[in-house]
From Swiss-Prot:
Its EC number is 2.3.1.274. HAMAP family: PlsX. One of its GO terms (molecular function) is phosphate:acyl-[acyl carrier protein] acyltransferase activity. This is Phosphate acyltransferase. The gene is plsX. It is found in: Cytoplasm.
Amino acid sequence: MVRISLDVMGGDYGPEVVIPGAARALERHPDIKFVLFGQEARCTELLAKHPKLQASSTFHDCEIAVGMDEKPSQALRRGRGKSSMWKAIDAINAHEADVVVSAGNTGALMAMSVFCLRTMQGIQRPAIAAIWPTLKGESIVLDVGATIGADAQQLMDFALMGGAMARALFEVERPSVGLLNVGVEEIKGQEEVKEAGRLIREADIEGIEYYGFVEGDDIGRGTVDVVVTEGFSGNIALKAAEGTARQIAEYLRAAMSRTLLAKIGYIFAKSAFDRLREKMDPRKVNGGVFLGLNGIVIKSHGGADAEGFAAAIDVGYDMVKNGLKAKIEADLARYHGAQASEALPRA
């Protein structure tokens, strides 16, 4: 059984998306038990439309829903202990849930998660990891927005956590890890990135295979399983990729409807275009993972539909089933244990 708490009021559409999304996820994973946090007046009628979900859930009424435009500090002051977002996160502390999923305000969700769950021992700052479609399948990119201007040690931590996530998600023994840089040569890039590369290489971490520096086009190629960067460049890369996917989809749609011949050609090529659309569907890779906390937090896109939210639940389910938290803790313990041993004076 996997216990998943949901911030039912989070996102642009709240329970109108979260509840049917949870119902879809339950169809795929019948061993889920949901703990729902929301405003009863908005949720009761929607839940009644999904009797299987209702039977597999417990519902907690909450006074407050965090707004999508609220500042993190305001959301903390107003919603601590009372909002659906806070209570969904706190369900992990109360041992009622193994993972929390929310489509709410990213800044507020991160602030509440850090305040409520705290960071793991040895982790200075958390990271947001995104699952990224590539020519070879999927890769993980982190950080995509949590820590702007991460230093070398924080990038080292991200490499450890990203490697653990890749082992949990892709089931590879030693995932390849690359540092995003402006070139692959050792002399290029900011000092923090070059120092992080040295730290990762010298640490010789058991759970990852350090590839070296990678460039922006390596992300989509799937050159490595994990791409490590700081939050500013990672977020720009993510938004640029999402925008490019929409742009290509619009180009194809316009091209296929321009002339009668193009429309006829589309009929014959429809299956190929359907496969392309499936590959580029952002709903299939919805669900950013907050790494470095004493609990698993999944962030869905705020504008996700029911299928997109269900995909975010799928990510949380997989992370619990494959022991993400334990893998990160074990890797951190090995790394920091080795560092402590090296620091001891020689007899």
